[in-house]
C-alpha cells in the first residue's frame, strides 16, 4: 500500500481535542485501519512486533501534529554514481502508521494531556511498543516528563529549526 494510511473516520480532517468535551483522539479514528485482533490481543496490523517511533509537534492554539512510524525492513537500492560506476546498497524502509493533525476546540485550546493519553492507549490497549517519542521544544517539557514517568523513552527534537532531520 502506497502512502501514509489515513485512520480518520469519514468526514474528519482534523481532530479537535480540548477540554470542552470528553472526546479523545481514538474516538475520531477507524480502528480497523491500523489495528487487528489476534486471539484475544489487539495489535497493530503492520509489523506488530516492530518498535514504533513518534514525534509530537505541539501547539495549543493552532495545529499540533502526531506522527508514528516503524522500520519495516530494508531494501536493496541499485544505480549508477556520477561517473557511471554501479553501486548497490541496502537502505532502511520506514513505514508510517499514521500522521494526525490536531486542532483546538471551538472555545478551548488543544488539551496536551489528551495527546499523552493517546500514547498510553496505543501502548496499553493496542499493543504498540515504542522505541522513542520525541517532541519539539515548544511546551514539551511537561508532556515528555509525564510520558517518561510512565516508562516511555523520550527526547526533544526540534525539526523546525534543524533541517538536518529532513
Regions found by a protein language model. Give the residues of each.
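Core RecA-like ATPase module of SF1/SF2 helicases and allied nucleic-acid translocases
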Residues: 158-166
Amino acid at each position: 500500500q502506497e502512502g501514509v494510511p489515513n485512520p480518520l473516520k469519514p468526514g474528519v480532517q482534523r481532530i479537535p481535542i480540548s477540554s470542552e468535551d470528553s472526546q479523545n483522539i481514538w474516538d475520531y479514528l477507524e480502528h480497523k485501519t491500523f489495528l487487528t485482533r489476534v486471539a484475544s490481543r489487539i495489535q497493530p496490523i503492520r509489523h506488530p512486533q516492530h518498535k514504533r517511533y513518534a514525534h509530537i509537534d505541539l501547539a495549543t492554539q493552532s495545529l499540533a501534529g502526531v506522527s508514528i512510524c516503524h522500520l519495516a525492513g530494508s531494501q536493496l537500492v541499485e544505480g549508477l554514481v556520477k561517473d557511471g560506476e554501479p553501486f548497490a546498497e541496502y537502505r532502511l524502509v520506514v513505514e508510517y502508521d499514521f500522521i494526525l493533525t490536531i486542532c483546538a476546540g471551538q472555545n478551548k485550546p488543544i488539551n496536551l494531556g489528551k495527546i499523552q493519553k493517546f500514547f498510553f492507549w496505543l501502548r496499553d490497549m493496542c499493543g504498540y511498543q515504542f522505541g522513542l517519542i520525541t517532541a519539539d521544544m515548544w511546551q514539551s517539557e511537561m508532556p515528555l516528563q509525564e510520558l517518561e514517568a510512565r516508562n516511555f523513552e523520550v527526547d526533544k527534537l526540534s525539526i523546525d529549526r534543524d533541517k538536518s532531520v529532513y
